[in-house]
Every structure is written in C-alpha cells, then in structure tokens.
Amino acid sequence: MPAIHGARAAEPVKIRFAWSTMPTHLVPAIFKTPVLKHHGKSYIAEPQNFSASTPMITAFAASQIDVGVFAPTALALAITNARVDIKVIADSLQDGRGGYRSQTLYVKANSGIKDVTDLKGKKIGVNGIGSASYTSIVAMLRKHKMDEKRDVSFVEVTFSNMLPMIEDDKIDATTIQMPMAEQLVKEGKYRGLFTSFDAMGPTVYNFLAARTAFLTANRAAVVDMLEDYIRALRWLSDPANKTEALRIIAAESKRTPESIGYLLTKDDYYRDPNMVPDIEGIQKTIDITNDLGFLAKRIEVASYADTSYVAEAAKRAAVAG
C-alpha cells in the first residue's frame, strides 16, 4: 500500500493562530497563498489579531488560541507567571541578523530629540509592556544610565495608532511600522533614534509558540501546517512570484503592493527559510530581559522548545520541492 502522509481526521483540525501586526507577521497572507497542500484538509488555520504578545498569554492560558507569534519576554512571563504549558516550535522573525532590518524607535525630525538622553521626561509609545520593542528600548535607556520608570513614561498603543498618536503629539517617540516609517524618513518628517540592534545586538524578535497539550493531541495537523507555512514562505520569497506575493500580502494588510516592496528583502527582518528557531538567540534575549529585572526568574529556553515538528515539516517541504 502507498504511504499515507499528513493528518487523517474526520474533520480538519482548527488551529487558532494569533498574530499582532501586518504585514510584518505575514500570518493571514501565508494561508492565502496558492501552494498550500494541507489547509482545508487536515487543518484549518484561523488567524486572530492581538495588540502584542503579552495579551496572548491570557488567551493561551484559557486555551483560546493554539499557536501564536510570540516574543521572548512573553514566553518567560507565560511560563514563570501564568504557568502556561507552552513550547517554542518554529522561527518567525530575527532582528538585526546579518544586516537585515532591526526594530527602530522613531521621533519627529523637528522634535529636538537628538540622542537617547533627550528622551528624559518624554512619552514613548509601545505596543505592549514586556513586548520585544519595549525590552529593547529599556535596554537602551539602561545603557545611558536612565531609569524607565522615573525618566520616561511608556504608553501602550496599538500598532495602527502609533503614527496618529505621535502626529498629535500625544507621544514623543514610537516604533512606527514599515512601510510608513521608511516613507516618513524619506520625506524628512521623522528620523530613527536607535535600533534594537544598537541596544542588544542581533536578537530573536518573534517565534512561533504553541500550547503543549494542543501539540501532543494534534501532531500530524501541526506538522502539516508548518509544512504549508514553509512552502508559502518560500513561494512568497521567490522573486518570480513577487507581483502576486505582494498583491496577496497587500490585500491582507490593507496596503498597496507598491508600499510593501521591502518585504522579504534585506530591508525586512530575517526569516529562517526552514523556520528553524534560534534557541540560543531566544535565550540571549530572555537573559537580557532577566538582567533588566523584568523576570521573576531565568528560564532555560531549551526546556520549553520542541523543534521536532518543524524539522519534520522542513524535511517534507524539501522533498516536495
């Protein structure tokens, strides 16, 4: 009898997939590409939008989501504070690796803020306390002998409201997302003050995490999903598909294709082509967070990772071509 691959179930397994920003996270677009083999058969992905990784912790704890684009600090908080049984399963975004993009804190060009110390007394907009961007900003403040609680004020702002808030002078600095950030800098209206790379060197920005119970109960479906994800990422990254790829991503992120041409180039964050998570990189980021005093205790990331799912998926995707 021929070998049977993929998940076999009476109904496709529903995978509730959390993400927080488009087009950066790509998640809704991934599942609209024309190269998916298993979507709608062994599994169905249901993308769900969150403001940041940290609100996902509660959703994971309540079994309201199954997989999420997660930040290192959120992982540590989920494990140590919320006692969520969760695993790192795949790569998503790496910051500042090999000359690729690094998250940037922007200020108005005419704000008078010339260096980090000029942030004293200012309001900084972040998508969430404990998020990856928050961690890098605090690390930079500490490098300049500044206290994040005494010297500045952090304001939690959704990604979509960051630009309106700084335009209205309700905040003084924020991590404006691409592609708008690039356009505003070209127009001379804004400037980058510093990057996450400046603060911490190359780090893991986000990765895919999943509930352990869900992984155990649905291994075949998760591997199928990751195989599709790798195939979709490969297809989106292929210059031969650029026009259609940008059309799909633009439609899912409510942008124009022309405005997101930077995606999946060196002007974008680094994405591992086989989605292999950088466990050491995640550990480095968490250790920095721990040194900053954000965590009750240090965790060993390797103890909360299972790369067997993505390894099997990558092997299948390579064979499938």
Where are the predicted features?
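Short, low-complexity disordered leader/linker segments with a strong preference
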Residues: M1-K14, A318-G321
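Ligand-binding "clamshell"
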Residues: I4, A10-E11, A78-S92, Q183-F197, ...
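Short, glycine-/small- and polar/acidic-enriched structural segments
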Residues: A9-D147, S153-E156, D172-M178, P202
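Pocket-lining segment of extracytoplasmic ligand-binding domains
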Residues: T73, K149, S160-A251
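Phosphate-coordinating loops and pocket residues in cytosolic domains that bind phosphorylated ligands
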Residues: G121, K186, D306
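Secondary-structure end/capping motifs
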Residues: T216-A296
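Conserved C-terminal helix/tail region of periplasmic/extracytoplasmic solute-binding proteins
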Residues: I286-G321
